[in-house]
Amino acid sequence: MDDIRVLIVDDEPDIRATVAEMLEIEGYSTEEAANGADALAAIERRQPDLILLDMRMPVLDGWGFAAEMSRREMAIPIVVMTAARDAARWASEIAATASLSKPFGFDDLIRTVNEVRGAA
């Protein structure tokens, strides 16, 4: 990859680490954030090419994060990743590009990220 940066936003450290490892195998650069507030700070430091976003997190959840991104007029593709059955609906609510239902495997993750990057 030409240094394509993916920001992984999830309150579960094991999920962040596993997703980062899978993406790095495929050549993506990753950064991790434990909640929406940490993600906004990470974006201020260096804007990613894509965001993988959990919806249910403490401090600032996925909805609040997406609202703040919209308020700041930041157009970074977002993939919602959640264990809830409503992943696709939630993705639609926040105008995300795609969704992944947890648990997801390597192939689903890489296919979704590649599709979103191809559409960007």
Label the model's feature ranges.
Residues 64, 85-101, 107, 111:
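Alpha4 helix (beta4-alpha4-beta5 surface) of REC/receiver domains from two-component response regulators
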Residues 41, 63-74:
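Short amphipathic alpha-helix used as the core "switch/output" element in two-component signaling
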Residues 13-31:
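Two-component/phosphorelay signaling modules centered on CheY-like receiver
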Residues 57:
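Receiver (REC) domain active-site loop signature in two-component systems and cognate sites
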Residues 54:
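Active-site residues of response regulator receiver
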Residues 1-7, 13, 107-120:
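Non-catalytic signal-transmission and effector/linker regions of two-component phosphorelay proteins
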Residues 79-82:
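Hydrophobic/aromatic residues positioned on beta-strands within the core alpha/beta folds
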